[in-house]
Design a protein with these regions (language model features):
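Bacterial Sec-dependent N-terminal signal peptides
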Residues: 1-25
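Short amphipathic alpha-helical surface micro-motifs
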Residues: 12-13, 25, 44-46, 85-88
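Short, well-ordered, aromatic-rich surface patches in folded extracellular/luminal domains
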Residues: 18-34, 74-76, 87-143
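N-terminal export/targeting and maturation segments
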Residues: 18-54, 60, 64
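Generic detection of short hydrophobic beta-strand segments and adjacent strand-loop junctions
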Residues: 42, 62-65, 80, 112-117
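A short, sequence-level motif marking secondary-structure junctions
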Residues: 45-48, 66-68, 118-124
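A short-motif feature that recognizes glycine-rich, charge-decorated loops
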Residues: 51-85
């Protein structure tokens, strides 16, 4: 009887932990664009956005963001299954001929980094397009 009760309690705690939304929190987003000789990395965390560029126009700027801005980014990410981001297909392939910058979107969630495959900057897969646009819109205030 004690064993059955103990097993029941363990199962209930396990089930509750798996459904806890806080256990699956997003820590940061990164959007990187690159080509031969230059890269730009946009990193968004709950309290700031950082833009770092290398190459001829190298710069590094950080701007604080508020909770409303962070929540707007989280809202755009809410429809994305981050565990399947690496399976998303790029709608175009202009980066192969240097007609567009390469771009990669990364999401850090529970100390795991999920990334898309490379896609054309300015034309992300439709599943992540609202999130990419929100990050770039927020970054306009940094550069």
């Amino acid at each position: 009887m004690k064993f059955t009760f103990l097993a029941f309690v363990l199962i209930m705690f396990s089930a509750n932990d798996c459904s806890n939304p806080e256990a699956a929190s997003i820590e940061s987003f990164s959007y990187e664009t690159f080509t031969r000789g230059s890269t730009t990395m946009y990193t968004v965390t709950p309290d700031q956005i950082k833009v770092k560029s290398t190459g001829v126009n190298a710069l590094e700027n950080i701007v604080n963001i508020n909770e409303t801005e962070w929540n707007a980014i989280l809202e755009k990410a809410s429809n994305i299954d981050v565990s399947k981001m690496s399976q998303l297909k790029s709608p175009t392939d202009s980066r192969a001929s240097d007609a567009a910058l390469h771009a990669i979107l990364s999401v850090r969630k529970n100390d795991t980094i999920y990334k898309t495959n490379s896609f054309d900057h300015g034309n992300p897969p439709t599943e992540v397009k609202p999130l990419v646009e929100a990050i770039l819109r927020l970054a306009e205030n940094v550069e």
